[in-house]
A protein has these predicted regions:
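Flavin (primarily FAD) cofactor-binding/catalytic cores of flavoenzymes
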Residues: 1-249
Length: 249
């Protein structure tokens, strides 16, 4: 069958077990429809963004290309989902001074006990489980994607490791004036929450392997390598020390 690209679907109904689709290129009928849409392509800046000084460049995650396309100087990345963490790492590895506002996004292993974690979860039936069978269907629908990366042939992201190497981590953005940015004192809580999900995924794989007597390499115990201390709370940042803010919210 031909593939038509750039089609805007305006309306979709089902009638007599048939789907009827209205688009900007006419009407179509189908026996099956796969809905694979989302809002990740729609910018969602924090309302306080309007208060930033005009000399600071503001861009959204979808506008980011690489470090060379940005003005020289420190960068604040707001949001620690997949885009935020990957962009922060990319800039950090290009020797830019990076500040990352860390939210409640969870993280995941990339490889564990000899396989890609997605492979394990698929074998365990996780991706085949209907929404209604989850403990909390509503939260599953709205859950943020776990952060990891395809960089270096695919690997996990440990923000604690980046902090040891020099990335500046802050809590969730709380207040913003023309002079400074205030962050919530929740960095430890957010890092612990991400690690909790990370360890829970590993534990579920361990249980599956044990239950099904599967031969697999032994897993290592995760131990946090860094903790925020009183002198690195990172709850305030002066706007004069920033060149760019990237919104990954």
């Amino acid at each position: 069958a031909d593939i038509l690209e750039g089609i805007e679907v305006k309306h979709l109904i089902i009638k007599n077990e048939k789907f009827f689709i209205s688009t900007n290129r006419g009407n179509f009928e189908a026996d099956q429809v796969v809905i694979a849409t989302g809002a990740y392509h729609v910018p969602n800046r924090h309302p306080l963004s309007e208060r930033l000084p005009t000399n600071i460049l503001q861009i959204d995650a979808r506008e980011y290309k690489n470090a060379n396309t940005l003005p020289d100087g420190p960068v604040l990345v707001v949001g620690s989902g997949q885009s935020g963490c990957q962009i922060a790492e990319d800039l950090f590895f290009e020797k830019r001074k990076v500040h990352l506002s860390v939210g409640s996004a969870p993280r995941s292993p990339r490889m564990y006990r000899g396989r890609d974690v997605v492979d394990w979860l698929d074998r365990m039936g996780y991706y085949s489980m209907p929404i209604g069978e989850h403990d909390d269907p509503k939260s599953v629908r709205n859950k943020t994607n776990h952060y990891l990366t395809g960089r270096d042939n695919g690997r996990e992201i440990d923000l604690r490791r980046r902090a040891i190497e020099g990335m500046n981590l802050h809590g969730r953005l709380e207040e913003l004036t023309i002079n400074d940015i205030q962050f919530s004192n929740d960095l430890s809580k957010n890092l612990d929450g991400a690690d909790s999900v990370y360890c829970r995924i590993r534990n579920s794989i361990d249980e599956w392997i044990s239950k099904n007597n599967i031969e697999a390499p032994k897993g290592e115990i995760y131990t946090p390598c860094w903790e925020p201390t009183e002198d690195v709370k990172g709850t305030q940042l002066e706007c004069k020390n920033l060149a760019v803010v990237i919104w990954c919210t």
